[in-house]
A protein has these predicted regions:
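Alpha/beta catalytic barrel-like cores
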Residues: 1-125
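Substrate-binding cleft of extracellular glycoside hydrolase catalytic domains
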Residues: 89-91, 98-177
Length: 179
């Protein structure tokens, strides 16, 4: 399956959300809780949403750090093989939901010092993000671009990564930590 087919399949083409089916799935995922406290009440997702209709197994990290996660710890081919192995294990353990691989890349890291602009964050170069996007294409994976905002603003960091966030398989993760 090529990337565009995977994205279309994952995102779905439904124009209307089947709320009864959604409610049933959410209740099942919450182990049919009878207290009424779980699952927490929340707005319905948009039609074609990935969650809760799929399980995502993601490998995390930053290519400049061996201590931040597996993306920087092991060579690409070994890491992708391990990720595909984990996806297969999860799919075998529970076939009720399709399992999707993902690469979760920390594209903006909080820093202990202010840096040139006193924002206490460091943006990774675009060529590193391009690398992750290309690796994801090889295995039809999702990409999560992780932003540790620090003293910057969500708006500034999102705008800096806008070209990636417009890609159909790229998603945003925000971490609002302050060193």
């Amino acid at each position: 399956m090529v990337k565009s087919e995977r994205v279309k399949k994952v995102r779905g083409t439904a124009s209307v959300l089947d709320t009864a089916s959604y409610d049933k799935l959410i209740n099942t995922l919450a182990n049919n809780d009878s207290t009424g406290k779980w699952p927490a009440k929340a707005p319905y997702p948009l039609p074609g949403a990935i969650l809760p209709y799929h399980r995502i197994v993601a490998f995390y990290g930053n290519l400049y750090s061996k201590r931040m996660g597996i993306l920087g710890e092991v060579p690409k081919n070994e890491m992708l093989k391990k990720l595909q192995g984990e996806v297969a294990k999860w799919q075998a353990a529970d076939s009720s939901l399709p399992v999707i691989p993902a690469l979760h890349y920390v594209a903006v890291t909080a820093q202990g010092t202010g840096g040139k602009d006193s924002k206490y964050r460091l943006r990774m170069p675009f060529h590193q993000i391009d690398t992750i996007v290309n690796w994801a294409k090889e295995i039809n994976a999702l990409v999560f671009v992780d932003i540790q905002v620090a003293h910057s603003t969500v708006k500034d960091e999102v705008l800096a990564l806008e070209k990636y966030l417009q890609m159909p398989n790229v998603n945003l993760e925000l971490i609002l930590n302050f060193p």
